[in-house]
Structures are given as C-alpha cells and as structure tokens.
C-alpha cells in the first residue's frame, strides 16, 4: 500500500523545466489526474495535497526546501499522518538511466542523489520506494567522456533537449498504471509491468 508520493525537484521558476525536477513533473501529473491542487503547507515544508487515485486517498508532496533538504518535508508529512517508510514512493531524476526509461525499486543506496540521501537520513531507513525517471548522463553527450562533478551539476540544472523531454514525458505516462498497482499492494506486478517496457 502506498499513502504518499513525493516528487523531488528544486522550487522556483528558474528550475521548473530542469532535469532535476523530473519528480515534480510526475507529481504534477498525478495531481491533475486526482483533480487536486497542491497548496503551500508550511508545516510540511512544501506543496501538498490529497488526491483520489486508484480508488484510494494518496498524499502528494513537492518539497520546497531545495533538493538536498528534501528529507525534512518528507518526514514532517509522514510523521503527521503516521505513514511508514515502505508506504512512500519518491520520484526522482536518475542519471544512470536514459531518457524514456523508468524503474521502480524499494531500498538501496542514494547513488549520489542528495535528495534521496537526505530522505534516508531523516527517515532513518532506506526502505522506501523510489521511482527512478531516466534523464541520461552528460558523459553520453557528444564530447561528454569523463564528465566531472561540475558537468553533472550543470547537466541536471539544465532543461532536457526536446526529444529527451518527450521521452521523459512518455516514461512518466507509462509509470502511472504501475504506480496504481503498487498503491494497491501488488509490487511484483507493478515492477514487472514497468520494467518489461523500460528502455
């Protein structure tokens, strides 16, 4: 069962269209589907709303704390509503997957993602679900061999190219039904459905 879906990103118009905000894009789509408007919730350090999705009430959250402090928002809402770590899905950009790929997994390391790292620290566990939305890696760009840390930061804080954006949008669309299966407690089918079409 899933009770909270968190999208990771950075607040502010200047970050809205950047690769790092792929998690926000997914949550925005779910809010539209659930006919809800996310509102500023100071006690939860973000934009939050309850949506009716897959015949269940599910909280949606977009932290407004900037990426590396996302855990504060997640733990605040989860504690208030007594939501357990394994009832949480965190949607985030994933550089180890190409644009158009999406994968679900529970637990595991942060893979260098500061948002995931902070959430694990605040929840004191890594046993929450992650929806990894592929955005690609700068080393795969022309002349991108041996991309350093600065290249990575610049890459995630820039908008994807048009064809990449289209692929990411398609991956988000394709993630909706598997998320519904996961929300209803069928994790195996959720992963099988999403991963059989993952590129």
UniProtKB/Swiss-Prot annotation:
Catalysed reactions listed for this entry: an N-acyl-L-alpha-aminoacyl-tRNA + H2O = an N-acyl-L-amino acid + a tRNA + H(+)
GO terms, molecular function: peptidyl-tRNA hydrolase activity; tRNA binding
SUPFAM superfamilies tied to this protein: Peptidyl-tRNA hydrolase-like
EC number(s) per entry: 3.1.1.29
Binding-site list for tRNA: 15, 66, 68, 114
Keyword list, A-Z: Cytoplasm, Hydrolase, RNA-binding, tRNA-binding
Compartments, as annotated in UniProt: Cytoplasm
Cited HAMAP family: Pept_tRNA_hydro_bact (MF_00083)
The protein's role, per its UniProt record: Hydrolyzes ribosome-free peptidyl-tRNAs (with 1 or more amino acids incorporated), which drop off the ribosome during protein synthesis, or as a result of ribosome stalling.
Subunit and partners: Monomer.
Family membership noted in the UniProt record: Belongs to the PTH family.
Record's protein name: Peptidyl-tRNA hydrolase
Species: Cupriavidus pinatubonensis (strain JMP 134 / LMG 1197)
